[in-house]
């Protein structure tokens, strides 16, 4: 009788824990859980519930990756603006006692856990827009004056701490676009083709993506998608499948994921998830477990993180996109 070793040339590993680095088709026996396991490629995406934020909030910002994420700012009812900052390690959130210098909601962020950027937002008393820009070094936030040239809230953004991009926002709805060089913001006279607030954004300063949002006129939600090349915005005639506002997204211009938000005319929250390939949006059969708007995000199209949101929640969810390697338990069925 043929054996696995004879066919493959090696024996199956006996491990007390699943390996942190694995390859497609790798098989092992987990001696702790007493099951056989294999690594396979996910054919569709899926959401899994993670550990909650320490501070429940809405209209917060995020940065980083699925295993090294950052959550900051936001609000708790009725209108308490937050400066609190939390770091995620792939399992749990840890609060940093040193928060933002300017507590606010409806702000935007970009960068990584140890080098993040926060900008814009809404202050008390409402409605007071903020232009404040802060840099995070993994421990503390530093305010960088003078901030955005156009103070605004509920804007889109993307990029890094030294090459950021801000676009759109409200409540006086704008398409204004600004670029950050690590020291100051410069206004690009060419703004979004569709001015809007409560939009999603992701990518880099020279390859940005703007999608969805509220253009300020009925039906108040748009599917509009635009790509930025470092100079101008180009509208993609193929927009989102679900028009929405107050949602989020992450990834790059050619591989993005959008999720959550608020939809009309049903006036309900959604957990709908869509994938962008640089040309078209495709609706995923998998929706978030907790439908919500005003949430934060981090990560990539294949490994994203969604957290917080409204109704005010601390819920965290991890997204595994199609094509990602996943661990499965081998059964006889």
Q: Which residue ranges define each predicted feature?
A:
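Polar, enzyme-active/binding microenvironments
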Residues: 1-333
């Amino acid at each position: 009788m043929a054996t696995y070793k004879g066919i493959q040339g090696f024996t199956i590993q006996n491990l007390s824990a699943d390996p942190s680095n694995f390859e497609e088709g790798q098989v092992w026996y987990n001696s702790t859980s007493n099951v056989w396991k294999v690594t396979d490629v996910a054919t569709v995406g899926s959401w899994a519930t993670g550990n909650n934020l320490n501070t429940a909030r809405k209209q917060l910002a995020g940065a980083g990756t699925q295993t090294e994420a950052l959550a900051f700012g936001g609000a708790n009812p009725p209108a308490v603006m937050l400066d609190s900052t939390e770091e995620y390690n792939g399992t749990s959130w840890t609060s940093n006692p040193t928060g933002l210098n300017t507590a606010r909601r409806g702000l935007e962020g970009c960068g990584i856990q140890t080098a993040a950027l926060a900008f814009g937002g809404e202050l008390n008393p409402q409605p007071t827009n903020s232009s404040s820009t802060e840099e995070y070094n993994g421990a503390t936030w530093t305010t960088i004056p003078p901030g955005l040239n156009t103070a605004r809230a509920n804007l889109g953004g993307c990029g890094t701490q030294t090459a950021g991009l801000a676009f759109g926002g409200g409540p006086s709805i704008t398409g204004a676009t600004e670029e950050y060089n690590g020291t100051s913001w410069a206004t690009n006279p060419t703004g979004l083709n569709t001015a809007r607030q409560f939009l999603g954004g992701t990518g880099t300063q020279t390859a940005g993506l703007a999608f969805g949002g509220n253009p300020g006129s009925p039906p108040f939600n748009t599917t509009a998608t635009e790509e930025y090349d470092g100079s101008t915005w180009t509208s993609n005639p193929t927009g989102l499948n679900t028009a929405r506002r107050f949602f989020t997204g992450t990834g790059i211009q050619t591989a993005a994921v959008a999720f959550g938000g608020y939809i009309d005319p049903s006036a309900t929250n959604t957990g709908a998830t869509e994938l962008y390939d640089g040309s078209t949006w495709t609706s995923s059969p998998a929706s978030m477990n907790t439908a919500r708007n005003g949430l934060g995000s981090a990560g990539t199209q294949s490994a994203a993180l969604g957290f917080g949101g409204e109704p005010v929640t601390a819920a965290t969810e991890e997204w595994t996109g199609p094509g990602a390697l996943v661990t499965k338990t081998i059964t006889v069925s």
